[in-house]
A protein has these predicted regions:
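Conserved strand-turn element in the central/C-terminal portion of the radical SAM core barrel
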Residues: 6-16
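Active-site capping/gating regions of soluble enzymes
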Residues: 15-139
Length: 139
């Protein structure tokens, strides 16, 4: 059995990417403090965090390159090196955003973490939208 640790800062709100970075770092560090306190073997877990993004109601929009840089900064400063893998949440991003952001995170990855994804909505949204239509409207 592999524990999946899922701390998440939601995209809802007006927060900036810097606030997201600060709060995500704080939450991840606290999670690991507790895991270490309870003697969890960190080499046997998967971390499932959010990417560093501004809130959906924020005026700030950052590029995928900035998402990548801030997300990797957060991981390097917050996650112990014995954690083997990171499985990112899409967290309400569109299919395109989630894919572009993950692609750049992987390209820029200068950590020892194996990166992957655990997307639900970001992979299913288009199909669900089509399937929700009447058969006549699908063509």
């Amino acid at each position: 059995m592999v524990p999946i640790v899922e701390p998440e800062v939601l995209m809802d709100g007006e927060h900036s990417s810097d606030v997201c970075l600060s709060k995500t770092s704080e939450i991840i560090k606290k999670c690991f403090e507790e895991l270490i306190l309870h003697k969890v073997d960190l080499s046997g877990i998967i971390l499932k965090p959010n990417m560093i993004l501004s809130g959906t109601q924020s005026k700030e929009r950052i590029s995928s390159e900035e998402v990548s840089n801030k997300t990797l900064e957060c991981l390097k400063n917050s996650v112990p090196s014995d954690v083997p893998g990171i499985a990112f949440l899409s967290g309400g991003q569109s299919e395109l955003e989630a894919t572009e952001n993950l692609n750049l995170i992987n390209k820029n990855n200068n950590t020892n973490f194996i990166m992957t994804y655990s997307y639900g909505r970001a992979l299913q949204q288009s199909a669900l939208k089509v399937w929700s239509k009447n058969m006549k409207d699908r063509e």
